[in-house]
């Protein structure tokens, strides 16, 4: 099978998916939809580009996508390169000052901008931001209550791991109503100005 055959196959596959999705697109036209894009799905540049093309299609079909992205594997890779040890408790990364700095750098300075740029290249208008911007996500420190492998609850200091306390949707509504696609990194800020790393699933 040559490259043209592969292209035709991809086109037909996309056309079939679009046909199936059309009734839902029509039903939810002009509605805000929140999509979580996990770090494990960002396997390579091609995967990110394909995801962004799908987001552009949703936007052009009348929906208002809002992207909340993760970045766990990418953060882990960067920490490893810098020789910073990573510890987890029940799937949550224990986040000290140094780790938080890397988390913010990777999420906001790397992944966030790459997703927004790829969406823009698809002809849509994306804006990259984090939950700290305009105090969008007011967070508080995670209480550290987790369950171990034996399902026994214990309390662990997770450092700067937080949970959302309040979501200020004003900036999201302003952006989506003006034809922009918000791309949000899952960081939050506390009432006293502390930055917290938040699970993207929780934010979405």
Give the positions of each predicted feature.
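Nucleotide/pyrophosphate-binding catalytic subdomain
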Residues: 1-204
């Amino acid at each position: 099978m040559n490259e043209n055959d592969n292209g035709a196959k991809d086109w037909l596959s996309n056309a079939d998916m679009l046909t199936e999705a059309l009734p839902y697109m029509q039903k939810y036209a002009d509605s805000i939809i929140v999509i979580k894009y996990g770090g494990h799905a960002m396997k390579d540049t091609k995967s990110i580009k394909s995801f962004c093309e799908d987001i552009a299609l949703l936007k052009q079909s009348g929906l208002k996508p809002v992207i909340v992205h993760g970045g766990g594997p990418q953060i882990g890779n960067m920490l490893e390169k810098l020789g910073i040890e990573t510890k987890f408790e029940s799937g949550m990364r224990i986040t000290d000052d140094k780790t938080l700095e890397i988390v913010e750098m990777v999420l906001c300075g790397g992944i966030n901008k790459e997703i927004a740029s790829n969406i823009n290249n698809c002809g849509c208008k994306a804006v990259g931001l984090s939950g700290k911007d305009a105090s969008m996500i007011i967070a508080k420190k995670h209480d550290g209550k987790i369950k171990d492998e034996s399902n026994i609850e214990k309390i662990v200091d997770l450092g700067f791991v937080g949970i959302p306390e309040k979501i200020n949707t004003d900036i999201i509504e302003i952006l989506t109503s003006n034809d922009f696609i918000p791309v949000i990194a899952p960081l939050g800020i506390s009432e006293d100005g502390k930055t917290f790393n938040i699970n993207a699933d929780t934010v979405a």
